[in-house]
Design a protein with these regions (language model features):
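P-loop/Walker A NTP-binding module and the surrounding RecA-like catalytic core of P-loop NTPases
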Residues: 78, 82-304
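Non-catalytic terminal/linker segments enriched in charged/polar, low-complexity residues
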Residues: 1-102, 117-119, 123-130, 150, ...
């Protein structure tokens, strides 16, 4: 996993240039202003950046003169990510089935995430049902069918333009009838400032609540890593409508910033659970803060 992270985070690492920044320290001391600029430009956000720098300053001040601030920074970032309860935890299971509701804006990667989660669960020996509740986007149902076939999961769908709630209801019954372990619901993408669409999403969530008594509930917001700090607005808006239990950060291999992953959970209390590193089924992985930070900063793995 570390080698894959290191490879896929190359663009982010190059853009941030943490090692190059700290390599100047022996001649000029640490440029806190430059570090602040790097973190903010990398979409970490002002609040999180200030906390990172304050914490790092404190650690540097009590360390010896030979301390490597890059290594200390990796520890600071890792510890901050781990402070958010649930960070990097897999989908939860009990004796009853688990229902996973995927929500997010258009183009965030919900459909492929649904299939990749199903594929991962299949490797653990769990049976899943995929609910094609995106009944509005042209080709959405067929896309999920194709991805579901690749993942080895059954897809429950209705004709295009049908009622998403009815799809979810039928998928719940299919999950129970077939003795499956998990139902993953793919919903239509919606802008977080469109009240009518958000109300529809709340209705779908309510159908799950009403018909899945005793089930484990997960609600994941799927965020495109390229969205930057706009992702925080999405977390806040969707979280008002659906009780979010985690974030899935997709397309992390396509961004040259990526700092939103450091601030999303911390500022709003929703943990990052999974991260997408590519197009393959195997490229959706659990988010491991330690390995992520090591790959982001580079050359610090052995001593963190």
């Amino acid at each position: 996993l570390f080698s894959k992270l290191s490879e896929r985070l190359g663009r982010v690492r190059e853009k941030w240039g943490i090692q190059a920044l700290f390599s100047e320290r022996s001649r000029n001391g640490i440029s806190w202003e430059s570090l602040e600029e790097v973190l903010i430009a990398g979409d970490v956000g002002v609040t999180m950046t200030e906390r990172v720098i304050d914490t790092l300053r404190a650690k540097v001040s009590v360390s010896g003169p030979d301390v490597d601030p890059a290594k200390l920074l990796s520890v600071v970032l890792r510890d901050m990510l781990l402070e958010v309860k649930g960070t990097g935890e897999p989908i939860r299971f009990s004796s009853a089935p688990t229902a996973v509701l995927l929500v997010g804006v258009n183009g965030s990667g919900k459909t492929t995430t649904a299939a990749k989660l199903s594929w991962n669960l299949g490797r653990e020996g769990r049976k899943t049902i995929l609910a094609a509740a995106d009944t509005f986007r042209a080709g959405a149902v067929e896309q999920l069918r194709i991805w579901g076939e690749r993942a080895g999961a059954r897809v429950v769908s209705h004709p295009s333009k049908g009622d998403p709630g009815a799809v979810v209801f039928d998928a719940i019954k299919a999950t129970e009838a077939r003795g499956c372990d998990c139902l993953i619901v793919d919903t239509a993408g919606r802008l977080h400032n469109r009240d009518n669409l958000m109300e529809e999403m709340a209705r779908v969530s309510g159908i799950i609540d009403k018909n899945c008594a005793g089930w484990v509930r997960e609600s994941f917001l799927v965020i495109d890593a390229v969205s930057g700090q706009n992702g925080l607005k999405q977390v806040e808006a969707f979280g008002k409508v659906v009780p979010l239990t985690g974030l899935v950060m997709t397309k992390y291999d396509h961004t040259a910033k990526g700092g939103v992953i450091l601030s999303a959970g911390h500022e709003l209390g929703v943990p990052v659970r999974y991260i997408g590193l590519g197009e393959g089924m195997e490229d959706l992985v659990l988010f491991h803060p330690g390995e992520f930070v090591e790959a982001l900063i580079a050359d610090v793995r052995k001593e963190v």
